[in-house]
């Protein structure tokens, strides 16, 4: 079946959680002139939010948080109980179906970054750095190593807490800032251990705020990312994004694989909201209703409806098109169907799927939401009750 061009392009951009780049320093040419040949230069006084001294503000910021940035080495054991060749009919014909094969183990090494947030040994990092790891080793900048225990992970926000036991020794702690008062153009300093190069620092700015997970290319996450052009490389995942004062404002997470200078960090305020739950081994509540959706405009709906091969007729309005209703979910129980267009929530007009997701998240668990939707030429009002997200990858 041939679909319209815009409909065939539904999907996220490819995203690498660790993408690498190497950098070099170029020597700049200098022009030299005799002092007598030049007129006196005017003295210009400039104001700056960061003091201009012989010491770089970046160095000062990194000296404040850098000692608390850690390297996280992981080992994951993957066990395969059967070999694919055993399912081959010809193999089974010659050797029988009960041919004994012992389980095979494969050990996969991984590496990422993190940072210590209190002197008891609590470390924040990305869930994808430690998820499924059977062994975690944490290395500090001063060379000390500790066995790490994964206390909790949350795939929906890609956050995790790892605990080390300091055994009476003092630990450096990174000061946590806030992400609520950030501005586009603020300095952004990424610290981590890319491609095995410990204690690497890169500098950039905040490119934009509130970048949705769908725009970042990872629509299964519920994060409004900080976008930065500070280089984020393999092994940077889980490391801190600092402001000019050396305070943690985000957790470096991902970049766009189809571009350069576009990286994403989880706002630190979102991490602070769930860190205690993760440290206690708890489950972070994530309400959902169970639909896969996309934004739709009048023009897109008209283009779809003119195509005789379109899978369904779409109401010609701005709204949220339901692409799929997951089985056994609140949406299915409420009677929502594929092809419906959601146009209002609790009486408030809506046309952005990211906003609907925020409304569901903020509503909490077991809360009733009234959805106004269009189905063909009919307008319906359905009530859906939120529930705990069962499988973040669905």
UniProtKB/Swiss-Prot annotation:
Residues 1-24 form the signal peptide. Transmembrane segments: none annotated. GO terms for molecular function: identical protein binding; serine-type endopeptidase activity. PROSITE patterns: PDZ. GO terms for cellular component: outer membrane-bounded periplasmic space. Induction: Slight induction by UV-B light. Residues 293-377 form the PDZ domain. InterPro entries: HhoA_HhoB_HtrA-like (IPR048172), PDZ (IPR001478), PDZ_sf (IPR036034), Peptidase_S1_PA (IPR009003), Peptidase_S1C (IPR001940). Disruption phenotype: No effect in a single knockout, but growth is inhibited at high light (120 umol photons/m(2)/s) or at elevated temperature in a triple protease knockout mutant (hhoA, hhoB and htrA). Triple mutants are not phototactic. No effect on the PSII repair cycle, even in the triple protease knockout strain. Disulfide bonds: none annotated. It is found in: Periplasm. Gene3D superfamilies: 2.30.42.10, 2.40.10.120. It holds the Pfam family PDZ_2. Keywords: Hydrolase, Periplasm, Protease, Signal. Its main location: periplasm. One of its GO terms (biological process) is proteolysis. SUPFAM superfamilies: PDZ domain-like, Trypsin-like serine proteases. It comes from the Bacteria. Belongs to the peptidase S1C family. A putative protease, its function overlaps that of the related putative proteases HhoB and HtrA. NCBIfam families: HhoA_HhoB_HtrA (NF041521). This is Putative serine protease HhoA. It comes from Synechocystis sp. (strain ATCC 27184 / PCC 6803 / Kazusa).
């Amino acid at each position: 079946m041939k679909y319209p061009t815009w409909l065939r392009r539904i999907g996220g951009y490819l995203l690498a959680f660790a993408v690498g780049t190497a950098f070099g320093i170029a020597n700049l040419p200098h022009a030299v002139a005799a002092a007598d040949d030049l007129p006196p230069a005017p003295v210009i006084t400039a104001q700056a939010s960061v003091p201009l001294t012989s010491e770089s503000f970046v160095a000062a910021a990194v000296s404040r948080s850098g000692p608390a940035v850690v390297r996280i080495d992981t080992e994951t054991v993957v066990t395969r109980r059967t070999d694919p060749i055993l399912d081959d009919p010809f193999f089974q014909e010659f050797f029988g179906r009960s041919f004994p094969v012992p389980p095979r183990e494969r050990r996969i090494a991984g590496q990422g970054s993190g940072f210590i947030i209190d002197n008891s040994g609590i470390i924040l990092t990305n869930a994808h750095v430690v998820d499924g790891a059977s062994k975690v080793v944490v290395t500090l900048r001063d060379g000390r190593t500790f066995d790490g225990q994964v206390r909790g992970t949350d795939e929906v926000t890609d956050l995790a807490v790892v605990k080390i036991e300091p055994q009476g020794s003092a630990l450096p702690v990174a000061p946590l800032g806030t992400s609520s008062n950030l501005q586009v153009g603020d300095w952004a300093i990424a610290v981590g251990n890319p491609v095995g190069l410990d204690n690497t620092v890169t500098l950039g700015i905040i490119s934009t705020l509130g970048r949705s997970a769908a725009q970042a290319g990872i629509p299964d996450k519920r994060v409004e990312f900080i976008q930065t052009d500070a280089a984020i490389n393999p092994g940077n995942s889980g490391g801190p994004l600092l402001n000019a004062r050396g305070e943690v404002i985000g957790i470096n997470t991902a970049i766009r694989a189809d571009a350069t200078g576009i990286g994403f960090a989880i706002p630190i305020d979102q991490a602070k909201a769930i860190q205690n739950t993760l440290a206690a081994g708890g489950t972070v509540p994530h309400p959902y209703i169970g639909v896969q959706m996309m934004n739709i405009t009048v023009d897109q709906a008209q283009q779809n409806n003119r195509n005789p091969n379109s899978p369904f007729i779409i109401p010609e309005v701005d709204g949220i098109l339901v692409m799929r209703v997951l089985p056994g979910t609140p949406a299915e129980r409420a009677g929502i169907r594929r092809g419906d267009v959601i146009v209002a929530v609790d009486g408030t007009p809506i046309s952005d799927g990211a906003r609907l997701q925020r409304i569901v998240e903020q509503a909490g668990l077991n809360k009733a939401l009234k959805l106004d939707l269009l189905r063909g030429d009919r307008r319906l009002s359905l009530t859906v009750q939120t529930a705990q997200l069962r499988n973040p990858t669905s």
